[in-house]
Amino acid sequence: MHALQAKILDPRIGNEFPLPAYATTGSAGLDLRAMLKEDTLLEPGQTLLIPTGLSIYIGDPGLAALILPRSGLGHKHGIVLGNLVGLIDSDYQGELMVSCWNRGHTAFNIAVGERIAQLVLVPVVQAHFELVEAFDESQRGAGGFGHSGSH
């Protein structure tokens, strides 16, 4: 398990609400909570930037974090991330914020402390461009959308 530096920015974390933790030994994501001042109604089509009350510092340029939606919120209520996925670079040290978008047809109440997203650490490979006149031939070539089959 990799050590991750974290700062609690909202004193309710660790007291009223638990620190992010893996739910099972096979869990990939840590749940992030809505550390709002009060319950908030998210209307259909509305987007809201929600504080998590937590900042992290990954430090290792070989790692990054992704903020991903919780599957149940999207499937059952139409609550997804406004930016679809959040990328946290290894040198970022500010508060983790979650952009929530209600793509559903009914208003959704976000309760204080509700689990709204999940944080997943991922490996990073940085690349540099090697400019070429032509690519080595491949089986796929430049075939794009739908090229590898109809379904």
UniProtKB/Swiss-Prot annotation:
Q: Give the highest taxon in the source lineage.
A: Bacteria
| Listed HAMAP family | dUTPase_bact
Single Gene Ontology BP annotation:
dUTP catabolic process
Keyword check for Glycoprotein, yes or no: no
Ligand binding (substrate): 70-72, 83, 87-89, 97
Function (record text): This enzyme is involved in nucleotide metabolism: it produces dUMP, the immediate precursor of thymidine nucleotides and it decreases the intracellular concentration of dUTP so that uracil cannot be incorporated into DNA.
Major enzyme class: hydrolase
Q: Which PANTHER family does this one have?
A: DEOXYURIDINE 5'-TRIPHOSPHATE NUCLEOTIDOHYDROLASE (PTHR11241:SF0)
Please report which protein family the annotation says this sequence is part of: Belongs to the dUTPase family.
Q: What pathway, per the record? A: Pyrimidine metabolism; dUMP biosynthesis; dUMP from dCTP (dUTP route): step 2/2
Give the organism the record lists: Pseudomonas syringae pv. syringae (strain B728a)
Q: Which InterPro entries match?
A: dUTPase (IPR008181), dUTPase-like (IPR029054), dUTPase-like_sf (IPR036157), dUTPase_trimeric (IPR033704)
Please report the name of this protein according to its UniProt entry: Deoxyuridine 5'-triphosphate nucleotidohydrolase
Report the EC code(s) recorded for this entry: 3.6.1.23
Q: Which Pfam families match?
A: dUTPase
